[in-house]
């Protein structure tokens, strides 16, 4: 929705200007048109498209496709510092009307529409069931009360750069930005540090959340900016939300149609069924000292 797009990029621009050192140059500044973020919207009978314009952001070093333990430890510490800094300035940011629940409400509207019944034929009931499971867990863990901070969700070694001593230097690509719990960043961070490393051909399996390499990342993150038990238990629900929102609902906007269809088929055959058994919260909690 264009209104959410405009809202998000206004927040990003304020965030870019308000982040203190060492993150004061981490994000690009938007071009401005008067007092507004410079966007352009094109609409006709078939298309409703929009873009936003940013100043260039400098790049430092890219991480290797497969990280070693030094990189993982440093990234755990760096992302903890970044999230903590974002939390400290979150009160200075414009309000956001988009939440996890409003996105799922929108998905339900689509599923209940004539278009949605055709687009998601045979899987409408499964989508409703997954939304119900998410909302039950959200209520049990009181996840709506988690602090809301700026999160970019999609992290991969192609959209941020680091210094030689693995300090976060710059980030570009803000397509999935939102104000939400810091936990929304963790599925993609688990992929960044995974044993498989960064890949050009991929699936969205839950496996990276259970790897020892991600546990190493969490330990170093937790030592700087401690996680709560409820946040750890919410990790598989963040994964569930990601599949519902970015694969099922918006997949055809972010991926080529053929690849979007592949990911959606995998969602029903593999991703959703793996949620209950693919992540051991107790193992993580014990490792973090709970």
Give the positions of each predicted feature.
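ATP-binding pocket architecture of kinase catalytic cores
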Residues: 1-90
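Short small-residue beta-strand/loop micro-motif enriched in glycine and branched aliphatics
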Residues: 60-64, 170-171, 198-200
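All-alpha amphipathic helical-bundle segments outside canonical DNA-binding/catalytic cores
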Residues: 70, 229-239
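Active-site acidic catalytic loop and adjacent metal/ATP-binding pocket
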Residues: 136-184
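Active-site activation/catalytic loop segments of kinase-like enzymes and analogous catalytic loops
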Residues: 184-225, 240-258
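ATP/Mg2+ or Mg2+-diphosphate-binding catalytic cores
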Residues: 245-290
